[in-house]
């Protein structure tokens, strides 16, 4: 098998721990949401996303209702584009004030740097908004890694469990599906990418998945427990 022409990676559970997102980022956004909406609700960008939440509810409601809705969506881990955008704006404040840095596994940081040095273009596809992704990599435990990434994709390109999303990404980066390696910890995402013709690898990290996925679950995907085990 030849070396892929591009590598597309997920973040949560792949380059970075699930617990950081669930135990640090989500609670931070939930706590900060009321004050953020009150302080920035008249900003056009923020109001745009709040209006999308109102459209989803289907009612003309006050901001307090929107805040409660957004907090409920955080609790439910809802993959709504407006929520992800607002979370990204809030996390941006957190990174700037050094309330936290983004977790990235050491093996992921090392391998991303090596692939970049070898001339393999790197792309990110996450349910988090593109601005949030950029902040995540710019403020990681391993320093500013954002310069390693050629381009970024979020759910505006489509849901992560639909093969059409991966076809769109392949078209946008100008690389045939079979020449792209997609990395994720979610089998349904890998299945969708494979249907779009991409190569796939399951990150089955013991820190995130203490019980390894079975051979039946893994199917035809390459299974690894760290980036260092990946075979290109």
Curated annotation (Swiss-Prot):
Reaction(s) catalysed (UniProt annotation): 5-methylsulfanyl-2,3-dioxopentyl phosphate + H2O = 1,2-dihydroxy-5-(methylsulfanyl)pent-1-en-3-one + phosphate
Domain of life where this protein originates: Bacteria
An annotated GO BP: L-methionine salvage from methylthioadenosine
Designated name of the protein: Enolase-phosphatase E1
Names of required cofactors: Mg(2+)
PANTHER family reported for this sequence: ENOLASE-PHOSPHATASE E1
Organism: Xanthomonas axonopodis pv. citri (strain 306)
Lineage: Bacteria, Pseudomonadati, Pseudomonadota, Gammaproteobacteria, Lysobacterales
Cofactor note text: Binds 1 Mg(2+) ion per subunit.
Pathway: Amino-acid biosynthesis; L-methionine biosynthesis via salvage pathway; L-methionine from S-methyl-5-thio-alpha-D-ribose 1-phosphate: step 3/6; Amino-acid biosynthesis; L-methionine biosynthesis via salvage pathway; L-methionine from S-methyl-5-thio-alpha-D-ribose 1-phosphate: step 4/6
Designated gene of the protein: mtnC
């Amino acid at each position: 098998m030849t070396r892929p022409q591009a590598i597309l990676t997920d973040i949560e559970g792949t380059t970075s721990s699930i617990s950081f997102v669930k135990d640090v980022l989500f609670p931070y956004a939930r706590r900060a949401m009321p004050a953020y909406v009150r302080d920035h609700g008249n900003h056009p960008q923020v109001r745009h996303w709040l209006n999308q939440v109102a459209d989803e509810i289907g009612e003309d409601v006050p901001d307090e209702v929107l805040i409660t809705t957004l907090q409920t969506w955080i609790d439910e881990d809802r993959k709504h584009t407006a929520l992800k955008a607002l979370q990204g704006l809030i996390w941006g404040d957190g990174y700037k004030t050094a309330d936290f840095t983004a977790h990235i596994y050491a093996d992921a940081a090392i391998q991303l740097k090596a692939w970049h040095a070898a001339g393999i273009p790197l792309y990110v596809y996450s349910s988090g908004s593109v601005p949030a992704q950029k902040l995540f990599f710019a403020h990681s435990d391993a320093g500013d890694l954002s310069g390693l990434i050629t381009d970024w994709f979020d759910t505006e390109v489509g849901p992560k469990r639909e093969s059409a999303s991966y076809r769109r990404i392949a078209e946008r980066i100008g690389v045939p599906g079979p020449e792209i390696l997609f990395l994720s910890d979610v089998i349904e995402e890998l299945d969708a990418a494979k249907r779009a013709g991409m190569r796939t690898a399951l990150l089955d990290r013991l820190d995130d998945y203490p019980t390894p996925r079975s051979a039946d679950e893994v199917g035809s995907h390459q299974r690894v427990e760290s980036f260092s085990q990946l075979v290109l």
